[in-house]
Amino acid sequence: MNRSLMRLFGLMAVALTVHANTFYVTIAGLGGEPDYEQRFALLASETEKTLKTHAPDASIETFKGPDATRANIRAALGRIAAAAKPQDAVVILLIGHGTFEGDYKFNLPGPDLSAQELAELLNKIPATRQLVVNTTSASGGGNEALRKANRILISATKTGSEKNATVFARFWVEALGDPSADTDKNGSVSAMEAFRFAERKTKSFYEEQKRLSTEHAVIEDSPKGGAAGQLAMNFPVLRLNAETAAADPAKRVLQAKRDQVETQIDQLKYQKSLLAPELYRTQLSKLLLELARVQEELDK
């Protein structure tokens, strides 16, 4: 299919969904350590800000810290089930840690949320277009339970055995606010476009760090599994606001600085076993403060 046809189909998909509502639910789960808690919460906050900028009329719910409980998630999805119509769309973003021991679980304060339970909650929502973006460790382990017709699945890892902390979330969130992710220039970032953006950035991260990649993201839109196709390409995750889509040089500098600090934190954690505990804590604290400062500037 040539690029002009792909762009036409993309524009048609956006046009068809103008009068439908999109329900966004972003959850930053349990970090386990202060640095993860802070970074997960920052990513959730950044996502919320981007969504409110580009989709002010959408239904947006964000859970982080002590509010990211299984009970609150169940209640939020219950509200969506009561309000959504078949033509609507649902976008679920999971940020944090996951585990897989025969079944996948998303780590939360209090009881965890299993992939099977999440699937059951989503199955009650009448919206026929659904996207689940699971950026946690071991996230691929939940795909089998979550598969359903018209549901797009994106996971940071291919299987449940990839259990290390992931960086995919950072680049997925970045894709939502970066006009360059809209490769067909139709005014929206599709699930496929955001996935390819984040996948490419994740691969580059490990190459630049000269580290073996411990995460291999996948996207699928068939109940039988396998590679994604037209459904993912024509699912607009976010329509870009024309007034704010133009690149801001000052923001680009801050985003580059944030990425640099994030990378320094990752490098420090990678070298943790080689450092004295007090030195590690001091350096980590310094970097986390810098990350918070940069994010505060970005949020202005």
Predicted stretch roles:
Residues 1-7:
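Positively charged n-region of N-terminal signal peptides that target proteins for export
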Residues 7-19:
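Bacterial N-terminal signal peptides
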Residues 19-300:
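Cysteine endopeptidase catalytic domains of the caspase/legumain-like
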